[in-house]
């Protein structure tokens, strides 16, 4: 069965995710409106700026549709996308997870680091990245950086504090497709 991956395209780094999936031969739909959710099988919520993203979700009146989709279908949130999926006032509250925004520093403090995932070294690009600070027992820690979780999964939801779409390595995107 052919999968169609939606990439939320109202703000942030959605194009790099779309390009990564296209390089894997996957059909991609840029999601901007409520009816766009009806034609996709899974969704990526990209990085960007979480407050702006939340404001736009409400302004475009797609917050509720996004919540319903993420409650049952595979979803991958990177950086700001992970924040939106976590616990917090005005967030989707779909993960047993609390985050600290910009915990790894400001834009000038961005960095690249090797992390281990499924017995493979991958590159993590951390740009104003959140830190996953309270992880519930329903959440599986898939990867860490300096003893802090940076890649997590809870049921149908995958989140990363880093940006795998900014590398040439499709490992994390392939994992998401297999969920």
Curated annotation (Swiss-Prot):
<dbReference type="InterPro" id="IPR002161">
    <property type="entry name" value="PdxT/SNO"/>
</dbReference>
<dbReference type="GO" id="GO:1903600">
    <property type="term" value="C:glutaminase complex"/>
</dbReference>
<dbReference type="InterPro" id="IPR021196">
    <property type="entry name" value="PdxT/SNO_CS"/>
</dbReference>
<dbReference type="InterPro" id="IPR029062">
    <property type="entry name" value="Class_I_gatase-like"/>
</dbReference>
<feature type="active site" description="Charge relay system">
    <location>
        <position position="163"/>
    </location>
</feature>
<feature type="active site" description="Charge relay system">
    <location>
        <position position="165"/>
    </location>
</feature>
<dbReference type="GO" id="GO:0004359">
    <property type="term" value="F:glutaminase activity"/>
</dbReference>
<keyword id="KW-0456">Lyase</keyword>
<keyword id="KW-0315">Glutamine amidotransferase</keyword>
<dbReference type="Pfam" id="PF01174">
    <property type="entry name" value="SNO"/>
</dbReference>
<comment type="function">
    <text>Catalyzes the hydrolysis of glutamine to glutamate and ammonia as part of the biosynthesis of pyridoxal 5'-phosphate. The resulting ammonia molecule is channeled to the active site of PdxS.</text>
</comment>
<comment type="similarity">
    <text>Belongs to the glutaminase PdxT/SNO family.</text>
</comment>
<dbReference type="GO" id="GO:0036381">
    <property type="term" value="F:pyridoxal 5'-phosphate synthase (glutamine hydrolysing) activity"/>
</dbReference>
<dbReference type="GO" id="GO:0042823">
    <property type="term" value="P:pyridoxal phosphate biosynthetic process"/>
</dbReference>
<keyword id="KW-0378">Hydrolase</keyword>
<comment type="pathway">
    <text>Cofactor biosynthesis; pyridoxal 5'-phosphate biosynthesis.</text>
</comment>
<feature type="active site" description="Nucleophile">
    <location>
        <position position="79"/>
    </location>
</feature>
<feature type="binding site">
    <location>
        <begin position="48"/>
        <end position="50"/>
    </location>
    <ligand>
        <name>L-glutamine</name>
    </ligand>
</feature>
<keyword id="KW-0663">Pyridoxal phosphate</keyword>
<protein>
    <recommendedName>
        <fullName>Pyridoxal 5'-phosphate synthase subunit PdxT</fullName>
        <ecNumber>4.3.3.6</ecNumber>
        <ecNumber>3.5.1.2</ecNumber>
    </recommendedName>
</protein>
<comment type="subunit">
    <text>In the presence of PdxS, forms a dodecamer of heterodimers. Only shows activity in the heterodimer.</text>
</comment>
<feature type="binding site">
    <location>
        <position position="101"/>
    </location>
    <ligand>
        <name>L-glutamine</name>
    </ligand>
</feature>
<dbReference type="GO" id="GO:0005829">
    <property type="term" value="C:cytosol"/>
</dbReference>
<feature type="binding site">
    <location>
        <begin position="127"/>
        <end position="128"/>
    </location>
    <ligand>
        <name>L-glutamine</name>
    </ligand>
</feature>
<dbReference type="GO" id="GO:0008614">
    <property type="term" value="P:pyridoxine metabolic process"/>
</dbReference>
<dbReference type="GO" id="GO:0006543">
    <property type="term" value="P:glutamine catabolic process"/>
</dbReference>
């Amino acid at each position: 069965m052919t999968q169609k991956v939606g990439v939320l395209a109202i703000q942030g780094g959605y194009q790099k995710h779309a390009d990564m999936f296209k390089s894997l031969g996957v059909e991609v739909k840029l999601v901007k409106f409520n009816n766009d959710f009806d034609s996709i099988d899974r969704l990526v919520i990209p990085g960007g700026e979480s407050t702006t993203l939340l404001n736009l979700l409400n302004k475009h009146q797609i917050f509720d549709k996004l919540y319903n989709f993420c409650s049952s279908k595979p979803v991958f949130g990177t950086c700001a996308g992970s924040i939106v999926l976590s616990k917090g006032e005005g967030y989707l509250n779909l993960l047993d997870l609390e985050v600290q925004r910009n915990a790894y520093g400001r834009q000038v403090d961005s960095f690249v680091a090797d992390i281990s995932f499924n017995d493979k070294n991958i590159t993590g690009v951390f740009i104003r990245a959140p830190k996953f600070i309270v992880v519930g027992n329903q959440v599986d820690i898939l990867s860490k950086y300096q003893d802090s979780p940076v890649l997590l999964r809870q049921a149908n939801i995958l989140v990363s504090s880093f940006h795998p779409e900014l590398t040439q390595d499709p490992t994390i995107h392939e994992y998401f497709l297999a969920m």
